[in-house]
A protein has these predicted regions:
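Cys-His-centered catalytic/binding microenvironment captured across papain-like cysteine peptidases
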Residues: 161-166, 172-174, 183-263
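Intrinsically disordered, low-complexity regions enriched in proline, serine, glycine
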Residues: 8-20, 25-27, 46, 78-82, ...
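Short capping loops/turns at secondary-structure boundaries
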Residues: 55-59, 63, 138, 172
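Generic preference for well-ordered alpha-helical elements
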Residues: 10, 27, 60-67, 106, ...
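Active-site nucleophile-adjacent alpha helix/oxyanion-hole segment immediately C-terminal to the catalytic cysteine
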Residues: 1-57, 67-72
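Active-site-adjacent substructure of cysteine-protease-like catalytic cores
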Residues: 71-200
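Alpha-helix boundary/N-cap detector
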Residues: 21, 25, 132, 136-140, ...
Length: 263
């Protein structure tokens, strides 16, 4: 979805992404593009992890591989890690990982996650929970997402804020989803914010989601996820800044770094 959005809404991306082909390649072709990115020196440590070969395999890839692929075209892909404070030194000790000095800080995310199955899906109800630590962790991530989508708003209509911000690649425990928006309600006299992420999950059936959205019935069960569903110990996000890097800036993008946000 990141690539589809870039091709649809970013003029500068259309010219460089996948050789200016104007379409998203199939998986085998994406694997070849990733190997080409590695051969150009993007994410050297990540390439070594895969022995510089990914074509034809079914090996698990994640946020850093997506960043390497996008950066190889000059796109400014940024990674944000959400994790407990005790994990911070571990992230920074990983070759190629560092606190990005100029990454815009919207709020809370994770770099190397446990590579195991799990859809991360949760029941679509409001974010109430007796587990205060879980809600606190979720609130940090939710606030980051809210601030991200609130930046550079285009217009407001009936309480809906339109933005030109791209979707967020959302990684956790071997599964990736796409955050396309966020809801906020202000509760009580203290106007306490309550959030729900709007998430597209590749594990869901596209036709079912499309039907629910057209009929405006049942779509919440597919898209809405409250803070109580954020139960993983770590999370990772990727977004793409505007502009195309070249020269020295492009060389710096070869090293995959991340902005660490503490839960």
């Amino acid at each position: 979805m990141q690539c589809s959005h870039l091709l649809s809404y970013r003029e500068e991306a259309k010219r460089v992404l996948f050789g200016g082909s104007m379409f998203v390649p199939d998986i085998p072709s994406l694997q070849r593009w990733l190997e080409l990115a590695w051969s150009k020196g993007f994410d050297v440590s990540g390439a070594l992890h895969f022995d510089n070969r990914i074509c034809g395999s079914k090996r698990w890839i994640g946020t850093t591989e997506c960043a390497a692929l996008l950066r190889s075209f000059g796109l400014k892909a940024r990674i944000v890690d959400f994790a407990p404070k005790k994990s911070k030194s571990m992230y920074l000790s990983v070759p190629g990982s560092a606190i990005a000095p100029k990454v815009k800080s919207y709020g809370p995310m994770d770099r190397y996650v446990v590579k195991k199955g799990g859809s991360g899906k949760g029941k679509a109800v409001d974010s109430h929970s007796s587990n205060s630590s879980r809600i606190s962790k979720g609130a940090v991530l939710m606030e980051w997402v809210w601030n991200y989508f609130s930046d550079n708003r285009l217009n407001v209509s009936s309480g809906v804020h339109m933005t030109n911000k791209g979707p967020l690649y959302f990684q956790h425990e071997g599964h990736s989803r796409t955050i396309v928006g966020i809801q906020r309600r202000l509760l009580g006299t203290t106007f306490t914010p309550q959030y729900n992420l709007l998430i597209l999950d590749p594990a869901d059936f596209t036709r079912a989601i499309e039907k629910a959205l057209i009929e405006k019935r049942g779509w919440e069960g597919y898209l809405k996820r409250g803070a109580h569903t954020l139960t993983c110990p770590e999370y990772q996000m990727l977004y793409v800044d505007n502009g195309i890097a070249d020269g020295e800036e492009l060389e710096k993008l070869k090293t995959i770094d991340s902005h660490f946000v503490e839960f």
